[in-house]
Amino acid sequence: MCSSVTGKLWFLTDRRIREDYPQKEILRALKAKCCEEELDFRAVVMDEMVLTVEQGNLGLRISGELISAYPQVVVVRVPTPWVQSDSDITVLRHLEKMGCRLMNRPQAILNCVNKFWTFQELAGHGVPLPDTFSYGGHENFAKMIDEAEVLEFPMVVKNTRGHRGKAVFLARDKHHLADLSHLIRHEAPYLFQKYIKESHGRDVRVIVVGGRVVGTMLRCSTDGRMQSNCSLGGVGMMCSLSEQGKQLAIQVSNILGTDVCGIDLLMKDDGSFCVCEANANVGFIAFDKACNLDVAGIIADYAASLLPAGRLTRRMSLLSVVSTASETSEPELGPPASAAVDNMSASSSSVDSDPESTTEREMLTKLPGGLFNMNQLLANEIKLLVE
């Protein structure tokens, strides 16, 4: 911890995911930022916390220690597929009620926990969404087969709590859907969604931090399946995005109330987009590699900027420079499906490959010259300040 502390910032996560890449990277970045900015920092695991109401006031203990000075900002990373309102959200509500600024806030996390809840929030705001049906109760899947037929086959079927492309099916017809009803697990309801054929096996992952698009990645399936998730073997490459696509991603993040959000956009033949999903606990191992970014560092800078002193750190101020320059230097995404796929086959490699591998180095050298290395840009700016 550094001296002359000017603020207090915590990193709160769950024991089940704290050793995963995003959490380890965010922890690294927050420690570095807090030392650089002379901030008081603490990393906390959810199950170490005891919430109290004593003499009519909210309180907090961590591993038996009574906490007397609370953080001004808490960076939250919880496993959204398993978030429970009676435990995880209770902890986040407690901190929020005590005056802590959470990123993301509990309501924003809830808006993204359930895929249909996400669509409920976005509906009525002019956001392009695939037609989608769902139901109440856990045993009504079979009853929905006739109701959802108006969406036409093939149709997309998803568990509302699924993640990383799991529990997602493309139902060919009613018979196939009936067969699925006997095989699926019913812990959470499913949704039935209109199939966007032209985006089969392809989507655009957009990461938004603090209302700014920090990067975009085109993801493509390598085995013909509908899902393009890198965790399922898909490949990704940095891409530019049209202004319409960027504004759509920002609009979605704003409506959902997220500080950090991963938004997946489906592509149509006319170059427009519709929203597939939003993730408040977005992973970025593939994103960092494909886009040559340090997303954790951007998150840490934004967290520091939320402290009462109101400092906008240098990295966050440079994001607008990068965004503006990339708009003038990069070709926009939005060509017909075949063109994007051809580009992918010529320029991408598996994002799960060794970062030092020849294939990935070749991929990076083939990227358009106008694409930016955020870390290099920052290093150059800092060098100018020192000199």
Swiss-Prot record:
E.C. numbers: 6.3.1.17, 6.3.2.41
Superkingdom of origin: Eukaryota
Binding site residues for Mg(2+) 1: D264, E277
Catalytic reaction equation(s): citrate + L-glutamate + ATP = beta-citrylglutamate + ADP + phosphate + H(+); N-acetyl-L-aspartate + L-glutamate + ATP = N-acetyl-L-aspartyl-L-glutamate + ADP + phosphate + H(+)
Positions annotated to bind Mn(2+) 2: E277, N279
Region of interest called Disordered, as start-end residue ranges on this chain: 325-361
Metal-binding listed as a keyword: yes
Gene Ontology MF: a single term: ATP binding
Annotated tissue distribution: Strongly expressed in brain and testis. Expressed in eyes, thymus, lung, kidney, skeletal muscle, spleen, skin and heart. Expressed in neurons of the neocortex, the gray matter and Purkinje cells.
Primary location group: cytoplasm
Location(s) in or outside the cell: Cytoplasm
Classification via InterPro entries: ATP-grasp, ATP-grasp_RimK-type, ATP_grasp_subdomain_1, Rp_bS6_RimK/Lys_biosynth_LsyX
Gene Ontology annotations of biological process type: protein modification process
Note describing how the cofactor binds: Binds 2 magnesium or manganese ions per subunit.
Keyword Mitochondrion on entry: no
Keywords: ATP-binding, Cytoplasm, Ligase, Magnesium, Manganese, Metal-binding, Nucleotide-binding
Name of a matching Pfam family: RimK
Cofactor(s) the protein requires to work: Mg(2+); Mn(2+)
Low complexity bias locations: 337-352
Domain ATP-grasp: 119-304
Residues that coordinate or bind ATP: K158, Q193, K194, Y195, I196, K197, E198, S199, H200, G201, R202, D203, R219
Something else known: N-acetyl-L-aspartyl-L-glutamate (NAAG) is the most abundant dipeptide present in vertebrate central nervous system (CNS). Beta-citryl-L-glutamate, a structural analog of NAAG, is present in testis and immature brain.
Similarity section: Belongs to the RimK family.
Protein name in the entry: Beta-citrylglutamate synthase B
Native source species: Mus musculus
Gene that produces this protein: Rimklb
